[in-house]
UniProtKB/Swiss-Prot annotation:
GO annotation (BP), single: beta-glucan biosynthetic process
HAMAP family assigned: MdoG_OpgG (MF_01069)
UniProt similarity note: Belongs to the OpgD/OpgG family.
Localization of this protein: Periplasm
InterPro entries xrefs: Gal_mutarotase_sf_dom, GH-type_carb-bd, Glucan_biosyn_MdoG/MdoD, Glucan_biosyn_MdoG_C, Ig-like_fold, Ig_E-set, MdoG_OpgG
Name by which UniProt lists this protein: Glucans biosynthesis protein G
């Protein structure tokens, strides 16, 4: 009898849950599947030339009027503000509010915005539509709403946790990244946002994705906190065959850092939103790949089955590593993808694109499955994205991790004690970790290292680092053809015991 009562309660709970909202991801999926069966219609811009041709400084003058934040008059900790169209944000997106009883379009009004010195005709913008939206929440202080989510442009979105500033971005989907045919950028064309209650600590957003060769339905559950976590569910439909599908893509920027110092004199030791790709492979191996700003497009691939996690991290958060008071790269979040369920066979790819300045996002990573269904068939992906400054949680708890990677001109000390370059490239890699710090300084730690065909190792030494209470690996290579990339891998061992994650690196061509 007790079991029957429990089942009845569960059924009632299910019914109450399903009827609590007038909308679900299945509604978006129906629309996405219908769209996939039709020809693609490119979005049409309705933007007056005064807004389309404006410069960035002019666009920055258009500010949302905070007093008119959506849900200001509702008892909810979440508020919405909207982005005006302008520059290359020149096509409107539809934004809807979902309640328990209705789905209602949020209408554009120029009264939402302060236009600064931007001259415009009010009649031409009265039905313009929004470019995107942002979510505000009292994440840092109970009496102040701060931005925690920004959804603007293509399928990009940025998310913040407590005490963080915007850095890298996530995307809904990537298509044909780094292929000669050129990348296709899907866009979120419509959003549905559930109006949260006063006690809600999470916000649910649905999105309809569209592009020439794919459509998709997305559900994002935003859970703000010290680490803000986004629970993602997607249902993707191909319109046509694609060369490569990028699932759970992350986009970041790396201009220079300790492994690739600035080519010009700069007071900043490093300038990047992320400095490495971290991977937890399906077999349990942890891999750390420092990022580069190459002179030519570079792609690195890590084949595996059922990845357990991957992300672009900002390891090393001391202000002295960046010295930038304006842009605070030390406060920019890492993003970690945790897949749910089995993703099958495929690979994690890292794409590095040359850039001369920090305004260009030149780093992309994603999961790309080996097998794709026929057009019209549904693909399901579930995962979480954690936006964090606690990188100590994002490596193996019982193994050492790479603290820093430095690159140098290789040299040899002469009999007169003067160092002379010997035509090699040297890598200085510091490993540290809680368990490693417990090892005696005379532990016989060694490095298992290997390179691709384009180099030979001329020095592989490991020494105790009393400053970090870890071990430093010095790897010196003779590169055969500098016009080609050079691959290398290494891990610290003590006999048969592996002590560290795998350090994986690609020396760019012409470096």
């Amino acid at each position: 009898m007790m079991k029957m009562r429990w089942l009845s309660a569960a059924v009632m709970l299910s019914l109450c849950t399903s009827s609590a909202w007038a909308f679900s991801i299945d509604d978006v999926a129906k629309e996405a599947k219908t769209l996939a069966g039709k020809g693609y219609e490119a979005p049409k811009s309705n933007l007056p030339s005064a807004f389309r041709d404006m410069k960035y400084a002019d666009y920055q003058q258009i500010q949302f009027n905070h007093d008119k934040a959506y849900w200001n008059n509702q008892k909810t900790p979440f508020k919405l503000e909207f982005y005006h169209q302008g520059m290359y944000f020149d096509t409107p997106v539809t934004i809807n509010e979902v309640t328990a009883t209705s789905v209602r379009k949020i209408k554009y009004s120029p009264d939402y915005f302060n236009f600064g010195n931007v001259q415009h005709d009010k009649d031409t913008v009265k039905d313009l539509g929004f470019a995107g939206f942002k979510v505000l929440y009292p994440i840092n202080s109970k009496d102040k709403n701060d931005e925690i989510v920004s959804m603007l442009g293509a399928s990009y979105f940025r998310v913040l946790g407590q005490g963080q500033v915007y850095g890298l971005s996530a995307r809904g989907l990537a298509i044909d990244t780094a292929l000669p045919s050129g990348e296709e950028f899907p866009r979120f064309r419509e959003f549905w946002i559930e109006r949260p209650k006063a006690t809600d600590k999470r916000l649910t957003i649905y999105a309809l994705l569209d592009s020439p060769r794919a459509t998709g339905a997305y559900r994002f559950v935003i859970m703000p906190g010290r680490d803000t976590v986004v629970d993602v569910q997607s249902k993707v439909y191909l319109r046509d065959k694609v060369g490569k599908l990028g699932v759970a893509p992350l986009t970041s920027m790396f201009l220079f850092g300790s492994n690739q110092p600035s080519p010009t004199l700069n007071y900043r030791p490093a300038l990047h939103d992320s400095n490495g790709l971290s991977i937890l492979a399906g077999n349990g191996e942890w891999i750390w790949r420092p990022l580069n700003n190459p002179k030519h497009l570079a792609v690195s691939s890590y084949a595996m089955e059922n990845p357990q996690g991957f992300g672009l991290l900002q390891r090393g958060r001391q202000f002295s590593r960046f010295e930038d008071l304006d842009d605070r790269y030390d406060l920019r979040p890492s993003a970690w993808i945790t897949p749910k369920g089995d993703w099958g066979k495929g690979k994690i790819e890292l794409v590095e694109i040359p850039t001369n300045d920090e305004t260009n996002d030149n780093i992309v990573t994603y999961w790309t499955p080996d097998q794709l269904p026929e057009p019209g068939k549904e693909m399901n992906f579930k995962y979480t994205i954690t936006f964090s400054r606690d990188e100590d949680k994002l490596h193996a708890p019982d193994n050492a991790y790479v603290m820093q990677t430095r690159r140098s001109t290789g040299d040899v000390k002469q009999s007169n004690l003067i160092r002379q370059p010997d035509g090699t490239v040297a890598f200085i890699v510091d490993f540290t970790g809680a368990d490693m710090k417990k090892l005696p300084a005379d532990t016989p730690v060694a490095a298992q290292a290997s390179t691709g065909d384009n180099a030979e190792i001329v020095e592989n030494t490991v020494r105790y680092n009393p400053v970090t209470k870890g071990w430093r690996m010095i790897l010196r290579l003779k590169v055969k053809d500098p016009k080609k990339t050079t691959e290398m891998r290494a891990a610290l061992v003590n006999g048969d015991d592996t002590l560290s994650e795998t350090w994986s690196y690609q020396l760019p061509a012409n470096e």
